[in-house]
Amino acid sequence: MDILEETAAPLKDFAKNSIRLFKKCTKPDAQEFQKIALATLIGFAIMGFIGFFVKLIHIPINNILVGGV
């Protein structure tokens, strides 16, 4: 029985903590959702532009190094 309790105790603690976290969480209101969506959109745009410019710079460098076969 002692082994069973030792293996079940962490599972019980995890379940208890998960339920507590789930009850504490709330859905964002419309304004908060818009802020999060805008921040995500700006992040995606910045990362896209960085990737585009890195690619734009590396294509000519790669052609010079390879020799334009």
Swiss-Prot record:
Record topological domains on the Extracellular side: 62-69
Q: What is its main location?
A: endoplasmic reticulum
Transmembrane stretches in the record are 41-61
The UniProt entry lists membrane topology as: Single-pass membrane protein
Provide the membrane-side ranges marked Cytoplasmic in the record.
Answer: 1-40
Q: Residue span of the signal peptide, if any? A: none
Q: Which Gene3D superfamilies is this protein grouped with?
A: Preprotein translocase SecE subunit (1.20.5.820)
Q: Where in the cell is it found?
A: Endoplasmic reticulum membrane
Do you know which PROSITE patterns this protein is assigned to? SECE_SEC61G
Q: Which example biological process does GO assign this protein? A: post-translational protein targeting to membrane, translocation
Q: Which GO terms describe its molecular function?
A: protein transmembrane transporter activity
Q: Which GO terms describe its cellular component?
A: Ssh1 translocon complex
Q: Provide this UniProt record's keywords sorted from A to Z.
A: Endoplasmic reticulum, Membrane, Protein transport, Translocation, Transmembrane, Transmembrane helix, Transport
InterPro entries named in the record: Prot_translocase_SecE_dom_sf, Translocase_Sec61-g, Translocase_SecE/Sec61-g
Subunit structure comment from the entry = Heterotrimeric complex composed of SEC61-alpha, SEC61-beta and SEC61-gamma.
Function recorded in the entry? Necessary for protein translocation in the endoplasmic reticulum.
What family does the entry list? Answer: Belongs to the SecE/SEC61-gamma family.
Q: Report what the protein is called.
A: Protein transport protein Sec61 subunit gamma
Gene source species: Dictyostelium discoideum (Social amoeba)
Q: Which gene encodes it?
A: sec61g
